[in-house]
Amino acid sequence: MSVTETEFTDAVRSAVQDRGALLYLLIQAFKEAGCATDEPVRKALFRFGQLSGARLPPATTPRAFFDGIGATGKAGLPFAREEMSVDAAQGVYHLHRCPMVAAWRNLGASPEEVVHLCELAGCGDQGLISQFPELTMHFNETIAKGDAYCAMVVARNG
């Protein structure tokens, strides 16, 4: 069976959106039950990121990292990922879509909740990058905070 690029993009975007919805609903259920949620959620998402990062090829440069996560191929399509600059020291990608933010907003999360959920979800990104000790990752802008895109920055340590 052949899948078009649009079908692939829509399917992966939908899966990421479902993951975002699940995160939101779990946190809401924990809150309703009177459970503190942030610390266990942060730990679980960080560990999930570590597991994801462990499956990726080794990388010691931003280019190798982005190639390893498929940023330069079809894997970036659901996020409308755009390479801005990548050199030996730093790589910057703009992600023009975030299916998780879309899910949270569709479920009625307040702007403050969306920012908080994004910060929690970022623990997964930090877990992933932790598997690459030569690299760091941060987001200068985020769709959750109202920016036009998420600016993913991966840099070499030191």
Model-identified regions with their sequence ranges:
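N-terminal accessory segment detector
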Residues: 1-120, 134-149, 153-158
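Amphipathic alpha-helical segments that form well-ordered structural scaffolds
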Residues: 120-128
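A structural motif corresponding to the C-terminal end of an alpha-helix
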Residues: 128-134
